[in-house]
Design a protein with these regions (language model features):
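Bateman/CBS regulatory modules and CBS-like beta-alpha motifs in cytosolic regions of diverse proteins
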Residues: 1-14, 25-27, 32-33, 52-53, ...
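Helix N-cap and loop-to-helix transition residues
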Residues: 6-8, 37, 108
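Conserved glycine-bearing catalytic or ligand-binding loops at nucleotide- and phosphate-handling centers
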Residues: 16, 20, 26, 42
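Short hydrophobic beta-strand motif reused across regulatory alpha/beta modules
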Residues: 21, 33-41
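Short, flexible micro-motifs
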Residues: 25, 37, 70
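Conserved mixed alpha/beta catalytic, RNA-binding, or beta-rich assembly cores of soluble enzyme
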Residues: 42-43, 84
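A conserved regulatory-domain signal marking ACT and ACT-like small-molecule sensing domains
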Residues: 48-139
């Protein structure tokens, strides 16, 4: 089993579905030009989510409508937070909703209660993880 260049997310999906932990990467001529492993995919995931920057991650369930993520982002910015990453998912949510995961930093922890209160008016809070303080809250 090999994967082509450029590597696509569907390639990672095939590797996962078949429980393959690594595979050669081949060019258009079929020549092996490298390898891809689960560790490589984990590194990409870590880079995309911004977890290396620590900070705070909040998960929401919000209406799937234009502007719903912007509303959350505006609230965070208004409280002095800066966003590292925003991820969304439609897995395990009712029709018309989506999950939104926002990782942020630069927020004064003393302002966190007011931020959570305002965010809760805009979307359903699912959980909060403060990686610096090693604290988790599930709602």
């Amino acid at each position: 089993v090999g994967v082509g260049q450029p590597l696509e997310i569907t390639d990672a999906e095939v590797l996962l579905a078949n429980k393959i932990s690594g595979a050669p990467v081949v060019d258009a001529a079929g020549k092996v030009v490298g390898t891809i492993t689960q560790s490589d995919i984990f590194r990409v995931l870590i880079a995309l989510t911004g977890i290396g920057d620590r900070g705070i991650q909040i998960a929401f369930m919000t209406q799937d409508r234009p502007g719903s993520i912007k509303d959350l982002a505006d609230i965070i910015r208004n409280h002095g937070g800066r966003m590292v990453s925003i991820l969304t998912s439609y897995d395990n949510v009712p029709e018309g909703f989506r999950k939104v995961y926002i990782r942020m930093y630069g927020l004064d922890r003393a302002k966190l209660p007011a931020l959570k209160e305002e965010l809760a008016k805009a979307a359903k809070l699912l959980y909060l993880v403060d990686h610096r303080e090693n604290r988790r809250e599930i709602y």
